[in-house]
């Protein structure tokens, strides 16, 4: 029976090659598009390092405020500041961990003194960030709470940035300029895929070491590890 099906299909191909070619191409394209959509969706939800616990994450990207005097349906929406994030989420008892970090990476120049600068993607975080996300360290370690609270200028960088600046991944303890300010490397991690859109960056620093402060609010995002 199966042999007969193949024989009939082959005969059909020979009798109407153009129609058969269009049918085969259309079927292949439809399958390809379905697979592409499935893969794109899978990338968004499937756990992989450093976002291995995606199924336990709750992200708070933006907040909204409204006022009766503004009228029905009118509101102001946007990322939250540090004070708001701390007041609303750091005191929660249900999450295993709560991390606060800038809501997007910012292209920032890095270089060694006397050398041309190059742009990298910078993310400013707290110390809990390194508990929530599982980065693969090849050298050194992340900054801890004491370093974060003190606002020390330290940074975790990727392997590619380490090689670009120092021509080696053995960069712990070495100094470089981040946006013209001196920073010391505390750790080096494996490069992170841009598909890990929450944890992705090329350089991570404590937000207490920059111009961000409790009186100068910047847009921040919060991730709750449930």
Regions from the PLM with identified roles:
Residues 126-143, 153-224:
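Mid-to-C-terminal secondary-structure elements
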Residues 63-78, 87, 99-128, 142-154, ...:
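Short acidic/polar micro-motifs at solvent-exposed secondary-structure junctions
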Residues 56-58, 120, 141, 174:
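Extracytoplasmic/periplasmic beta-strand context in beta-sandwich domains
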Residues 16-44:
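Short, strongly hydrophobic transmembrane alpha-helices
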Residues 37-108, 218:
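Membrane-proximal extracellular/periplasmic loop immediately following the first transmembrane helix
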Residues 1-3:
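Short, Lys/Arg-rich, polar N-terminal cytosolic tail immediately upstream
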Residues 5-14:
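A short amphipathic helical element positioned immediately N-terminal to and/or at the very start
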């Amino acid at each position: 029976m199966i042999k007969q099906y193949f024989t009939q299909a082959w005969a059909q191909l020979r009798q109407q090659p153009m129609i058969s070619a269009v049918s085969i191409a259309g079927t292949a394209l439809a399958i390809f598009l379905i697979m592409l959509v499935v893969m794109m969706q899978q990338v968004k939800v499937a756990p992989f390092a450093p976002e291995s616990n995606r199924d336990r994450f709750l992200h708070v990207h933006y907040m909204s405020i409204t006022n009766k005097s503004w009228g029905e349906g009118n509101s102001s929406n946007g990322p939250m500041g540090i004070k708001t994030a701390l007041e609303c989420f750091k005191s929660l008892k249900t999450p295993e961990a709560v991390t606060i970090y800038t809501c997007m990476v910012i292209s920032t120049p890095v270089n060694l003194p006397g050398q041309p600068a190059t742009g990298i993607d910078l993310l400013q975080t707290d110390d809990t960030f390194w508990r929530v996300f599982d980065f693969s360290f090849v050298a050194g370690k992340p900054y801890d709470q004491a370093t974060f609270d003190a606002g020390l200028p330290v940074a975790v960088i990727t392997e590619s940035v380490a090689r670009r600046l120092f021509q080696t991944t053995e960069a712990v303890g070495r100094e470089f300029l981040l946006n013209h300010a001196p920073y010391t490397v505390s750790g080096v991690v494996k490069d992170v895929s841009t598909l890990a859109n929450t944890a992705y960056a090329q350089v991570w620093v404590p937000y207490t070491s920059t111009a961000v402060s409790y009186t100068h609010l910047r847009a921040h995002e919060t991730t709750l590890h449930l």
